[in-house]
Structure formats: C-alpha cells, structure tokens
Amino acid sequence: NGLCCSQYGFCGTTSAYCSRANGCQSNC
C-alpha cells in the first residue's frame, strides 16, 4: 500500500512517516 510506518505503529506517506531521521521503521 506504499505506507511507511513509524516506531510507534503509525503509518503514512509523508516525510513525517517515511524519513529515517523521524524514526521510520518499515517501507522507508
């Protein structure tokens, strides 16, 4: 589905979710 997910389990497609610097854990 193209979503990136953070270490807290929240997912989205913006840099807030997809940036490793912001804690992205999957589909980064």
UniProtKB/Swiss-Prot annotation:
Tissue and organ distribution? Seeds (at protein level).
Q: How is it used?
A: Has potential use as a flocculating agent in water treatment processes.
User: A Pfam family this protein belongs to?
Assistant: Chitin_bind_1
Q: Which SUPFAM superfamilies does the entry link to? A: Plant lectins/antimicrobial peptides
- Pinpoint the Chitin-binding type-1 domain residues: 1-28
Swiss-Prot/TrEMBL GO biological process terms = defense response to fungus; killing of cells of another organism
Keywords from UniProt, A to Z, are: Antimicrobial, Chitin-binding, Disulfide bond, Fungicide
Q: Does the keyword Coiled coil apply?
A: no
Disulfide cysteine pairs (residue numbers): C4-C18, C24-C28
InterPro entries in the cross-refs: Chitin-bd_1, Endochitinase-like_sf
A single GO molecular-function term is: chitin binding
Keyword Ligase (UniProt): no
Could you name the domain of life of the organism this protein comes from?
Answer: Eukaryota
Q: Coiled-coil ranges per the record? A: none
The function of this protein is: Chitin-binding protein which functions in defense against chitin-containing fungal pathogens.
Could you identify this protein by its name?
A: Morintide mO6
Give the species this sequence originates from: Moringa oleifera (Horseradish tree)
